[in-house]
From Swiss-Prot:
The keyword Secreted applies. Coiled coil: none annotated. Acute phase protein with antibacterial activity against the Gram-negative bacteria E.coli (MIC=6.25 ug/ml) and S.sonnei (MIC=12.5 ug/ml). Lacks antibacterial activity against the Gram-negative bacteria P.vulgaris, P.rettgeri and P.aeruginosa, and against the Gram-positive bacteria B.subtilis, S.aureus, M.luteus, B.megaterium, C.bovis and E.cloacae. Its main location: secreted. It is found in: Secreted. It comes from the Eukaryota. One of its GO terms (biological process) is defense response to Gram-negative bacterium. GO terms for cellular component: extracellular region. It comes from Sarcophaga peregrina. Synthesized by the fat body and secreted into the hemolymph. The lineage of its organism: Eukaryota, Metazoa, Ecdysozoa, Arthropoda, Hexapoda. This is Diptericin. On the 2D-gel the determined MW is: 8 kDa.
Length: 37
């Protein structure tokens, strides 16, 4: 929770990560990669 961006992004992360693993950033990165492919 220490590398969380501004509150606005923090609200969207859980939805983008779909519960991703470990940290919101990890789930967010994985989701972005999936969308690009």
């Amino acid at each position: 929770d220490l590398h969380i961006p501004p509150p606005d992004n923090k609200i969207n992360w859980p939805q983008l990560s779909g519960g991703g693993g470990g940290s919101p950033k990890t789930g967010y990165d994985i989701n972005i990669n999936a969308q690009q492919k």
